[in-house]
Amino acid sequence: MGILHPHLQLYPAETAWSYASRLAALHTGGTLASFLVDLGILMRDLRAGEAGAVSRLAEVAGLDSEALARTAIRSSNGRFLTLRNETFTPQFISPREARVCPSCLADDEAEDLNLPPGASWKQRIAWRLRPVAACPAHGVGLVDLAPDVPFRNMPEFGHLMAMAGGVRRLVERAEPSAPGLLQLWVHDRLDGRADDGGPWLEGQTIEQGACACEVLGAELLFGREQSLKSFKALSQEQWKVAGACGLEVARGGAEAVRAALDVIRARRAGSAVQAGPEKTYGLLYTWLHFRSPFLDPGPIRHELREHILDHLAIEPGETVLGEVVAERRMHSERSLAQALKLTRGETCRGLVRVGLMPPGLPAVAAARLAFQAREVERLCAAVEGAVTVGAAANLLGCTKAQVEGLCEAGVLAPFVDHGLMGATRRVVLPADELADLLARLKRMAARADAASGTLEAEAAARLAGVPYGRLVALVLEGRLGQPCWLGLRSGLSALGVRESAAHAFMSSRPEDLLVPT
């Protein structure tokens, strides 16, 4: 068969399938299936965009094969589709093949009055893409010609138009709808126009960028209001708004995406004690977690995974978004307690001591906190070097009762309640605090001997009428004058207080220093 006459011009924005249907309507007035049989083209090959089928159609139509190939959606490797320079999955194609803009079809009829209607109606490529829901030229929503007909039983386009009652009836059914910002980005990307999505989107496929924008925007706008399952019920208008929101974020690059993840996490952080990734990041995490490992979602997965590891207490060996966690980055109060083999109360006191937790924080609020693993190394080191009360007494050169008194007065901060120390053999006191206490007292003290009017700390406490631990606290506060360091002694047994200072304090001590003994 030679070149068909009359020649039918190819519209660059229509699909190869649409052109073949128009060619059949012009030259035979019959069905596309019988027309393709006459040309020796298998319908399934043309639907799949097979190079041989497209080339044969271009040959008989007198078209440049490359021009027609640019309008064909081709199957690639069984998992992907290609269109022009874009690659995407079948999920990016609308399952409704018969979506049209009635106003565009009316324009087609008006422009080609000499052609039969079936030869003038052009099915636009953009109508096949899932994010496209409205016509930017006419400001109306796309109309589904056969919403109740399964895809496999879909009649040919001409028959669908007859079922719908023609173009005029379709125009009456169309509703005003402006295209969303994300749809306009898809149009520009597909047509090869300058990409204003920024470098973060520019490095992604059209599907990766569009899906990331939609889901990120949906979680930002509706994540707090919808349960995870109800996102399927979002309306077309809600998805349009979500896509626009996500696009604005994506245009700001990776930094803006991370800031959006901060917002999502902050909104959901109070919903549960130590909520996992699904509770914290909602739809965004669910979408990425259950996505096929063979379908790369693009850099949004990396950004979310890094955000999870930087903010949630994830155990080494756990799998997060398809990758095993090699090293812990964050600790929760619970996981840290388990690692240190302490109670959660002891751990919280340790975190307060190293400045990682504010004092007096309610237990529920404390359980929601997460701490950088490197930051809590100070606490880990303190626990590793901690000693028992008896060992602390030996290191300080005092009695166990005096160590307990120092804890009662707040001079030492144990890992367990000081009220329990007499009944426990647990590691309770960080050794570095003991050394720091002795060093501070030595720096404050002047050397003296027992004959210079100086009392040992225990005797000075009795004279001043305060417990031993409170006396040491008063010395550290400078309220008993300069202490003395008695020669030939070690540890706290060398601590001395001027007798005159103890007498003066006894006669004028404020009531708030009276501590029951």
Predicted feature locations:
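Intrinsically disordered, low-complexity regulatory/linker segments
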Residues: M1-T517
